[in-house]
Amino acid sequence: EIMPSLVGSEMCIRDRPYSVDALFSAINKGRMVQFRYKKVGRPETRTISPWQMVWENGCYYLIAYQDEKSPAGIRHYRVDKMAGVLVLDAPRRGKAQFAGFDLPSYLKKHFNMYGGPEHSVTLRCTADLEPAMRERFGTSPILIPEGETHFHFTVPICVSDQFYGWVCGFGGKVEITAPAAVRSGLQEMT
């Protein structure tokens, strides 16, 4: 249920499939938003603090701080799954959490924008995959050679089925070596 006492203004967008303008307005004004999030079978009302928007995989995503559910923290929401976006009078929260926020790093660890528990994952790859790994993870990870045939590196990953699918897509040329729980998660899927 939307709380009328928090509502500052409702942005009505014509000729746009999503409430992008309302969200940009809230970001620029430093205000919280409330919306219905369309989850399969159970839409939920959310009240969050928007900070950034990104276009990824053909969709807009709102990067926001949420503290209405535990654990509080930075989350992302697909904008096309939002309905009834309201810009509230309440000032947004999460300034400390976004002070050092690095959007490119956030995007690299979320495969296809799916969330999951974050782990430091060590990947062992065949040498021919160096360009593909650099394209995905950038120049930050240190690639440690293992002779002339392989290398390994460690990166933060939000582990999800999409991450496991990405690993499998290399046809055995990428191996998860650590941590054991993430490695066994892939073995359970295959």
Question: Could you tell me what each predicted segment is?
Answer:
Residues 6, 47, 76, 154, ...:
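Short aromatic/basic micro-patch
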Residues 1-8, 12-13:
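Single conserved hydrophobic/aromatic residue that forms the stacking wall/gate
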Residues 103-190:
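Polybasic (Lys/Arg-rich)
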